Amino acid sequence: MRLFLSLLVVVLSIVLEGPTPAQGVPDVSNPFDVLEEFGKTLEDNVREFINLITQSELPAKTRDWFSETFRKVKEKLKINS
């Protein structure tokens, strides 16, 4: 759920950011070019975001925490049984 919300915030920030000065006024000759450019920009930003998440220590720490918690609960259930 948090990943979904994070991605939603990234997409909204990209959309609300607007055009950069180098882009200027888009050419209306082919509206699909604008859509294709937006898709490529969005793809690059999402890939960068996913790489940032996968290279961080957060997933490893979370996995370790879940493993440790599961092990503790399992031990408590063995003792009580």
UniProtKB/Swiss-Prot annotation:
Main location: secreted
Position of the signal peptide: 1-24
Record key words, sorted: Lipid transport, Secreted, Signal, Transport
BP GO annotations: lipid transport; lipoprotein metabolic process; negative regulation of cholesterol transport; negative regulation of lipid catabolic process; negative regulation of very-low-density lipoprotein particle clearance; triglyceride metabolic process; very-low-density lipoprotein particle clearance
Example of a GO MF term: phospholipase inhibitor activity
One GO CC annotation: high-density lipoprotein particle
Key word Chaperone present: no
Protein family per UniProt: Belongs to the apolipoprotein C1 family.
Protein name (Swiss-Prot/TrEMBL): Apolipoprotein C-I, acidic form
Species assigned in the record: Cercocebus atys (Sooty mangabey)
Name of the encoding gene: APOC1A
